[in-house]
Amino acid sequence: MSDTTNDRLDVLAVGPHPDDLEITCGGTLAKLVRQGYRVGLLDLTSGEPTPRGTEELRAREAEAARQVLGVPLRLNAGLPNRELMDVPANRYVLATLFRRLRPSVVLSVAGRTPAASPDHHQAHLLIEAARFWSQLTKWDDRFGDTRPFRVPHLVYAPFPFDAEVRHWHSTFVLDITDTFAQKLAAIRCYASQFDEARFAKVSHFVTGHAIATGSRCGFAYGELFALPHPVGASDLHALVHGGKGSPAPVPLPQDPAQPPQ
């Protein structure tokens, strides 16, 4: 991909392992594609080693999930799983990718997950740092001779099992009622990580979280996002009302065991 305006991504979602983006924001990614935005996925590591996975199998699963979500581009940064750290060498790799892909929005996983991989929190820190480094001048030789680029917008997709209750500057919820089934189907692609018994537990948790998140805004299913700054607006009515027309009717939540068709 070149760095011309026509090739730039609208949204680049970045996570540490294949399956993290599907769990945190899979419904929104599928919705962005349906809305006509240019979307890319970037896994920082292969996710291996794991007890039942291999590099080749995880790559096939990630590709299958990409197809389910309808996202046209999925890349892997090749950083080490289990040892992912926010260190200068990794910042160079990720900042170089930001310079090459030149996204308008970087969608970053966020949160501390002590019951799961520490890679999750390190990815959060690394993405923030690489976003800053990607704009630095007089260092082009450290970024593969790519041109400096500042990612205009950073949006957090918090892990639903974050260990902390965070006080973000701003949060909002995306309605994923029409893409929730795609989200679950994409997660199910990772059979090496989620056998039938474990997928049933993950599906139950993800479904319950999406219902609880969406219900706060009148949606059947929702995904939470956060910003590192307050929301700016010039029209209070449009901001809270969603436009000048009458709001669309809100669908009622379905049975958690029955995702929308």
Predicted features and spans:
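Metal-dependent de-N-acetylase/amidase catalytic core
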Residues: 2-12, 88-261
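Active-site rim/loop-helix segments in enzyme catalytic domains that contact anionic ligands
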Residues: 1-102, 238-239, 243-245
